[in-house]
Amino acid sequence: MNDQIEFLGGRVLLVIGDITRQDVTAIVNAANSTLLGGGGVDGAIHDAGGPEILKECQQIRKTVYPKGLPAGEAVITTGGNLPAKYVIHTVGPIYGRDREREAELLAACYQNSLLLARQHGVTSIAFPSISTGAFGYPKIEAAKIASTAIRDFLGADSHIRQVRLVFFQQRDARVFREYHEF
């Protein structure tokens, strides 16, 4: 598989690589509700972005979400030491915890991140595969939900010119490529 595949006339790119190195206006962090960093993508973003991101996340926890960021919601911080100007933090659903709303919550992660991006003048954004790691969301179902949410948003919005879907492993990118709904 190539390192990059285009969808929707180049507005959506499927990329294999490191999300912390993407040259975009904003990257999305598949965060945990504490917003204090963790493993996987969350830890990598906090490590690469430096202490400024953590400081802003702590302030958000203190003033806006003292009980933690709810699943499906999104908040924005500086990009710190990252190439991206912003990091948009969103918490995906933990698979099996809320069966009635899992798909809705996962779609909301993408929708709310894109809305927040538009509000901050973001023209390019990179997403990881939200909830498919430690949160256990099935990758095929997640690919369908993510691609539908992104397609629907871009169909109604021309401000965001490029969305990158960044996968660390080729096998995950292959699943997305096979099951997307663009």
Model-based region annotation:
Residues 1-182:
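Macrodomain-like recognition of ADP-ribose-binding/processing modules
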